[in-house]
């Protein structure tokens, strides 16, 4: 079974969920959205993110693939009504940036769950953020374990390749250590840079720095100025690997001194 053989459900229509919906619909695939608020549902339809949308989890009954485009805290504490609505025969995958706790939570909750993570994004969020071709040429990694359904894994690979992504698999622990280095730590370091510049005690120097800041500072600090809740969730859910990465970065700074 491939992605084009039935209906794809997307839970959450922010940047990642909305972008997946746009790309799948462009391929003629039926997309069923599930969101919390009716206002979000209305805007999702206006933007063409989905074929149909609802605030009722029962809408997922028709879906052969369900994509959990949810924040990490929501993935780790799924709603009971939502869990009951997931079809047992459907393939279920997530898009969270931390894999060990998500895999641990979900592998016992659904027999066809595949932990995955598309490595793509922008600084935008919410129902207005979805865009075409977000995943083109970007990595998409799955972290199966010994009990992961191989046919379900193949469906998620088909999804990733349809969206133009480069497909990878790794152990969940390896994924979390790698993204701590190249994704999670940069967010924290960038936020620290913004704070250091903003906390300059001399008001004249601080004002001059703000006036002179240009593309170099913008590029270096961009990821640190994003959604603070997202950064906190990434760091707290991947704490051990992030601390290890920060220790390595601290050592590098000490060598510069």
Pin down the residues of each PLM region.
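Interdomain hinge/lid region at the active-site interface
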Residues: 205-257
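Glycine-rich, N-terminal phosphate-binding loop of Rossmann-like dinucleotide-binding domains
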Residues: 69-71, 96, 144, 192
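NAD(P)+-binding Rossmann beta1-loop-alpha1 motif at the extreme N-terminus of oxidoreductases
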Residues: 1-57, 61, 65
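Rossmann-like NAD(P)(H) cofactor-binding subdomain of soluble oxidoreductases
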Residues: 78-128
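Short, structured coil segments at secondary-structure junctions
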Residues: 47-49, 109, 136, 163
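Internal alpha-helical scaffold of NAD(P)-dependent oxidoreductase catalytic cores
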Residues: 134-223
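Phosphate-coordination loops involved in phosphoryl transfer and adenosine-cofactor binding
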Residues: 4-7, 89, 137
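Rossmann-like NAD(P)-binding element
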Residues: 57-86, 90-93
């Amino acid at each position: 079974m491939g992605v084009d053989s039935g209906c794809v459900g997307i839970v959450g229509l922010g940047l990642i969920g909305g972008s997946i919906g746009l790309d799948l619909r462009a391929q003629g695939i039926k997309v069923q959205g599930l969101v919390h608020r009716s206002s979000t549902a209305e805007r999702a339809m206006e933007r063409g993110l989905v074929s149909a949308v609802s605030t009722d989890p029962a809408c997922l009954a028709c879906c052969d693939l369900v994509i959990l485009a949810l924040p990490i805290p929501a993935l780790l504490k799924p709603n009971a009504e939502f869990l009951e609505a997931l079809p047992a025969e459907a393939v279920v995958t997530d898009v969270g940036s931390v894999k060990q706790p998500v895999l641990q939570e979900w592998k016992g909750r659904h027999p066809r769950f595949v932990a995955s993570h598309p490595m793509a994004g922008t600084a935008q969020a919410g129902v207005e953020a979805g865009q075409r071709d977000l995943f083109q040429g970007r990595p998409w990694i799955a972290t199966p374990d010994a009990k992961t359904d191989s046919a379900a894994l193949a469906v998620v690979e088909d999804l990733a390749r349809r969206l133009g992504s480069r497909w990878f698999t790794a152990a969940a622990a390896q994924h979390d250590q790698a993204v701590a280095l190249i994704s999670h730590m940069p967010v924290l370091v960038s936020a620290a840079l913004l704070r250091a510049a903003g906390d300059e005690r001399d008001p004249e120097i601080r004002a001059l720095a703000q006036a002179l800041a240009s593309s170099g500072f913008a590029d270096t600090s961009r990821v640190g100025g994003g959604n603070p809740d997202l950064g906190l969730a990434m760091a707290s859910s991947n704490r051990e690997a992030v601390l290890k990465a920060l220790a390595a970065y601290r050592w590098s700074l000490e060598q510069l001194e």
